[in-house]
Amino acid sequence: MASNGHTLRLVINRDKHDSVIRGLYLVTDHDDNLIPRVEAAIDGGARVVQYRNKNQDRESRLALGLELRELCRRRSIPFIVNDDLEMAVSLKADGLHLGQGDGDPREARRVLGPGKIIGVSTHTLSEALEAQAAGVDYIGLGAMFPSRSKEVEHVAGSELLAAIRSSISIPIVAIGGITRDNGASVIDAGADAVAVISAVLSHPDPALAATEIALLFNRRAPFPRGSVLTVAGSDSGGGAGIQADLKTVTLLGSYGSSVLTALTAQNTRGVSGIHGVPPAFVADQLDAVFSDIPVDVVKTGMLFSAETIVAIAAKLTEYRRRMVVVDPVMVAKGGANLIDRGAVSVLKERLFPLAYLVTPNIPEAERLTGANISDEESMREAARRLHRLGARNVLLKGGHLLAGDSVDILFDGAAFHRFVSPRILSKNTHGTGCTFASAIATYLAQGDPLREAIARAKRYITAAIRLAQPLGRGHGPVNHILAAEDVRDR
C-alpha cells in the first residue's frame, strides 16, 4: 500500500514497439536445402520466419514445416504459417498469415486463441484499417517494388506506407521486391519489418544477405547508433590508427570499441618505433569485446604480423563476424613499413575471404596484386584481382593518381561504381585511409547500404582534408571535428 492509502498498480502499455514483428521477416521459398538456408538467415539476423509452401503434397509440407518449427523454437524465432489455418494448428505454429480474401482473421483468432500472431496482407488504407479493426497483430503491405517471386498487381510504394503508418497502431511489414539497396526507404517511411524471399534465400551467402538487410534497421535507433569495433595499431600522434578510428566513429554518432594490435612511437614526421602486441593478447581483447558488447561492424587497420592476422581471423570466424571492413594498412605516411613481409600473403589468404569490404589505396593494391596501376582501367583490373582473393566487395582508392578528380572504384563482383570528389592539394593528409574506412564502417553500422555508406564516408573524408589545419612539422592530420560538423549540416 502507498502512504496515501491507494494501491499502486503496474500498468503496461503494449503497443507496436513490444511486438515480435520487427526487423527482417523471412518468407520461405520452394527451392532445395531450405533448412540450412533458413538457419543461415537466422544467423544473419532474421527475426521472424513465415512458412510458405504451396507446391508439395500435404504430408511433405507438414514434414518440412515440423523441421522449420523446431529450428525456429531452438532459435527463439516466431514461426508463422502462410494461408493455411489447418496447417498452423497441426504444426502448433506461433501464428498465421492470411492473404487478402484468403480467410477470416476473426475465425483464425477463434481457432488459434489469443496468444497467437495473426497477420493479413493489405494493399490499401481501407484494407489496413479493416484488418486492424478485425484484431490482427500486424499487416503486410505491398508490393513496395516489383517482385521476382510473383506477379505484382498492386504497387503500394513508400508514400502509401507512410500514410498508413500515420493511421494505424499495429506493426506494418513491408513486402515486395525489397533488397539491401532499397530497403532503407521503406524503413524510413515507417515499416516495422521488411519481408524478403529471394533477396536472402537466393543469395549465395544467406547469412550475409540477412545481415545486410537487418542492419538497415539501425537507422531508427537512438544515438549512439550502431557499434563499431576497430582492430588496429595505436598512433601516439593521434592522427591515424585507433585514435583516428575512434574519433571518426564517435563524432559520426556510433559507439566505438577497440582492440590494439601494436603500439607506435609516431608523430607527423613519421614512425620511430613499433611494439607489436602479442597475438594471444590480441585474441584476449577480441574475446573481451565480442563476449559482452554488441558489434555491428568490425574495421581492421594495422595488423603488423602474420601471427596476429591468424589470431584475428580465427576470432572473426569463431564469433561469426560478417560485416568486416579491412583497411590493409602497410606503409605509414612517412614511409615506415607497418606490416611484416611475410604477413602480406597471410592477409590475403586468411583475412580477405572474411572481408565484407577491403579498402586499399593504389600502393597497397599494387603490392597485393603485383600490378602497375596508372589509370582507372588498371584500377578496375586490380579490383577484379583483389575480388578473386575472396572479399565480397573491393573499394580501390584513387587518391594517389596525380591528375584529375579523386576517383574511388567499388567492385562488388558484378559491377563497378565510381565515387568522385575534387582533388584537394594538402600535406595534411595523415590518417586519411584509417578515417575513410572507419567512416564507411560507421555508416554501415548506422543502417546505410554499402554504396550509400561509401558515398557519405567520401563526403566526410573530403571535408576532413579540406578543413585540415597545420599541426606539427610533417604531414598533419585531417580535421575530424569540423568534418563531422560539415557533413551533419548538409
Swiss-Prot record:
Note on cofactor: Binds 1 Mg(2+) ion per subunit.
Gene3D superfamilies (UniProt xref): 3.40.1190.20, Aldolase class I (3.20.20.70)
Protein's GO biological process: thiamine biosynthetic process; thiamine diphosphate biosynthetic process
Keyword Kinase: yes
GO molecular function annotation: ATP binding; hydroxymethylpyrimidine kinase activity; magnesium ion binding; phosphomethylpyrimidine kinase activity; thiamine-phosphate diphosphorylase activity
Transcription is among the record's keywords: no
Sequence intervals crossing the membrane: none
Entry GO CC: cytosol
Keywords: ATP-binding, Kinase, Magnesium, Metal-binding, Multifunctional enzyme, Nucleotide-binding, Thiamine biosynthesis, Transferase
Binding site for 2-[(2R,5Z)-2-carboxy-4-methylthiazol-5(2H)-ylidene]ethyl phosphate: 147-149, 177, 197-198
Record EC number: 2.5.1.3, 2.7.1.49, 2.7.4.7
Top-rank lineage group of the source organism: Bacteria
Cofactor(s) needed: Mg(2+)
Signal sequence range: none
Residue ranges, annotated region (Thiamine-phosphate synthase): 1-213
Sites where the protein binds 4-amino-2-methyl-5-(diphosphooxymethyl)pyrimidine: 50-54, 82, 121, 150
Biochemical pathway: Cofactor biosynthesis; thiamine diphosphate biosynthesis; 4-amino-2-methyl-5-diphosphomethylpyrimidine from 5-amino-1-(5-phospho-D-ribosyl)imidazole: step 3/3; Cofactor biosynthesis; thiamine diphosphate biosynthesis; thiamine phosphate from 4-amino-2-methyl-5-diphosphomethylpyrimidine and 4-methyl-5-(2-phosphoethyl)-thiazole: step 1/1
Binding site residues for 4-amino-5-hydroxymethyl-2-methylpyrimidine: 266
Hydroxymethylpyrimidine/phosphomethylpyrimidine kinase: annotated span: 229-490
Amino acids binding Mg(2+): 83, 102
Family listed: In the N-terminal section; belongs to the thiamine-phosphate synthase family.
Function: Condenses 4-methyl-5-(beta-hydroxyethyl)thiazole monophosphate (THZ-P) and 2-methyl-4-amino-5-hydroxymethyl pyrimidine pyrophosphate (HMP-PP) to form thiamine monophosphate (TMP). Catalyzes the phosphorylation of hydroxymethylpyrimidine phosphate (HMP-P) to HMP-PP, and of HMP to HMP-P.
Name the UniProt record assigns to this protein: Thiamine biosynthesis bifunctional protein ThiED
Organism of provenance: Geobacter sulfurreducens (strain ATCC 51573 / DSM 12127 / PCA)
